[in-house]
Amino acid sequence: MKKSLKLAAAATILATPAIADTIPVPYNTLNTNMENPLYMPGARVFYSKLSNGLMLKVADDSEAHKDKHHDGSTEFPIIRIQEEMGYGITDRLAAHFSVQYTHDDDIQRTGLSAGRLGLTYRLLNLYNGFVWDIYGDLHLGGIGEMRGQYNIAGDAATAQATLTQLTPAIMAGQMTKEQAAQMALGASLLDAHGVIDYDNYSNGMWGFHVGTKVGKVWDKLTTSAFVEVLRTFGDDNSRIRIAGSNAPILPGYSTALVLASMGAPSEVAAEFKSVTEVNAGLNAFYQWTSKWSTGAWFRYEHHADQGIEKITTDVAPELEMVKKALEDKLSDMNDGFDAYIIGLSAAHQFTDHAQVAVYGEYTFDNAHERSQNGTDAKVEAGVRVNFKF
């Protein structure tokens, strides 16, 4: 009897590794390779992913680019640096933070271009390799102001047409040429047009992202898909300089001169409308060896048209009609765009705690007429350095 018990105990001990071997290897590696799209840090593990990229863009022929005489222009190098870090609170719950900085010297635009802080929860992590995550992030666009310069020009055709209409009154002595000119100039400002030169990449608004990700692991192959929604909260966290054109509206009168004579402010704040945006994507990842891995992805981004709810800066009474006309004109800025991004990466695991990846992306886009984000070509390449401890 004692011999039988000993044999049973020995059999149990020998069988234990076999039971462990029935757990698929990928189930145990989702917290190992930081380039895996389903990566999540284990409990009490901190990770950092620092991406350093260079981008080249060729501007399309949108109305906004034409107004800036920038259509067809090449922007290079555009410096893009992104830091993503996270911490495993438990094996299923992780906190994460990311921030991106972009510098484009060709258009004198620089600053934080993305930022988010949030939590990811792993709802499912099955032994067959199926994974389901949900996450929610605070959108950090409200950290800084939206800054730029609105280059405004009165409509010369409107001024000339108004002056022509008033010519009989001038001939009849009902008004002077100077009075008629002032009316014509005022009418030209009501039909004014312009374009914003952005100083930075912030939209000046807080918001939140909510999203979900599902994936499956087959031995060395991982695939995943995600979809997320961003909702921003409109506010007037903006500072926009007003620059009148020096081109003549009427002989001897320019937009800059007319605005100065009317006491126009040098800068204004505007309350931008809340918007809803959508991102979605697919990822594939292959673990060739314990050291080498590659990834590929497709991502879709829908960026909504921006719009101004109202200009919150007080202006002189004679400028109220101009202010209202600008609010109406900019209520729908028609500057949205859709981006379709494909990317590839290759990574090498140097140690259990350090990894380096190279990556490249190409973007196709479909931009609205007043968008400054439309391109004929957009490509980015860079190096990402990953650590965990």
Identify the role of each PLM range:
Residues Y101, Q108-F272:
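Outer-membrane pore/translocation modules
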Residues S51-I81, Q149, H193-N203, E369-S371:
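Surface-exposed strand-loop-strand hairpins of Gram-negative outer-membrane beta-barrel proteins
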Residues N52-D60, V99-D105, L123, L138-G144, ...:
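Transmembrane beta-strands of outer-membrane beta-barrel pores
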Residues Y87, D91, Y121-L123, L138, ...:
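Residue-level signature of outer-membrane beta-barrel architecture
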Residues D91-F97, L126-W132, K220-S224, S290-T294, ...:
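Repeated loop/turn-to-beta-strand initiation elements of outer-membrane beta-barrel proteins
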Residues L30-T32, F46, I79-E83, S113-L117, ...:
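Hydrophobic, lipid-facing positions within transmembrane beta-strands of outer-membrane proteins
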Residues I19-A59, Y127, I170, A354:
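Outer-membrane beta-barrel biogenesis signature
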Residues A59-H70, D236, I242-F389:
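Outer membrane beta-barrel transmembrane domains
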